[in-house]
């Protein structure tokens, strides 16, 4: 049984490292699109792919909140056609939480999950 536990621990560590790298790529893409260095449609498609991947894997490795944050990020990105400085700052809010939770190594308790999810940017709030 110890060998299986070692494998699971290694896979979780790989997920953590991969997710931190994805957060870096997401933030780089946000900066490049907001700065006009990359085309918005290409960058936004890349953001969707990265968020979708994190969403799909997070729960399997004990980070359901990271999956929920990535899902919210996907929803936020869904209607974007460009990324200005305000959108960039809002998008970084998602990666900041993803990074903080992943670096902690554990999913927060339920009451903290609720607080974090309520703090995330939404498109409907921005439109109003």
Question: What are the functions of these language-model segments?
Answer:
Residues 19, 26, 44-47, 66, ...:
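Hydrophobic packing residues in well-ordered alpha-helices of helical domains and bundles
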Residues 8, 36-43, 66, 83-87, ...:
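Residue-level recognition of alpha-helical structural elements
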Residues 14, 77-90:
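Histidine phosphotransfer helical core of two-component systems
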Residues 4-47:
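Long, amphipathic alpha-helical coiled-coil segments characteristic
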Residues 42-79:
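Extended, amphipathic alpha-helices with heptad-repeat/coiled-coil or helix-bundle character
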């Amino acid at each position: 049984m110890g060998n299986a536990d070692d494998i699971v621990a290694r896979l979780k560590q790989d997920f953590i490292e991969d997710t931190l790298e994805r957060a870096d790529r997401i933030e780089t893409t946000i900066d490049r699109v907001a700065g006009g260095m990359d085309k918005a449609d290409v960058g936004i498609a890349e953001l969707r792919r990265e968020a979708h991947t994190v969403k799909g894997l997070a729960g399997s490795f004990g980070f359901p909140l990271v999956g929920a944050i990535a899902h919210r990020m996907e929803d936020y990105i869904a209607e974007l056609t460009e990324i200005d400085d305000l959108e960039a700052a809002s998008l970084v809010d998602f990666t900041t939480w993803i990074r903080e939770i992943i670096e902690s190594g554990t999913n927060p308790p339920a009451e903290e999950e609720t607080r974090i999810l309520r703090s995330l940017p939404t498109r409907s709030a921005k439109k109003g």
